[in-house]
């Protein structure tokens, strides 16, 4: 079985130190892959409440999202053999030459 994990990319846990620690630990412990996502938009007037808060509003900290390509580049610079991937990416918002690398 292969195991992959998501890098801390959104909210309060998305810090430089957390990304480095998780990427290095995953690489050292034999995790197969690290994953990121692409999030461009946030709902202004959601039709359903967010279940992660008492009042149903999306926390401001959750609106901070690291760019997926930048985050993968950062993870690659801090690991040796782990595979990297995107679970979701909006190709129209990224340079095709950069994505092809």
Please give the residue ranges for each predicted region:
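Glycine/small-residue-rich loop that forms an oxyanion/phosphate-binding "nest" at active or ligand-binding sites
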Residues: 91, 97-98
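Positions that flank functional sites
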Residues: 41, 90-91
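N-terminal beta1-alpha1-beta2 module of alpha/beta enzyme domains
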Residues: 1-78
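Conserved catalytic cysteine-centered active-site region
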Residues: 79-87
């Amino acid at each position: 079985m292969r195991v992959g994990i998501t890098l801390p990319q959104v909210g309060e846990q998305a810090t430089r130190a957390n990304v480095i620690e998780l990427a290095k630990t995953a690489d050292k412990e034999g995790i197969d892959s690290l994953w990121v996502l692409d999030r461009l938009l946030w709902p202004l007037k959601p039709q359903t409440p967010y279940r992660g808060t008492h009042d149903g509003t999306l926390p401001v900290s959750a609106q901070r999202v690291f760019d997926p390509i930048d985050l993968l580049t950062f993870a690659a610079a801090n690991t040796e053999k782990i595979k990297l991937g995107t679970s979701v990416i909006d190709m129209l918002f990224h340079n095709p030459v950069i994505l092809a690398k």
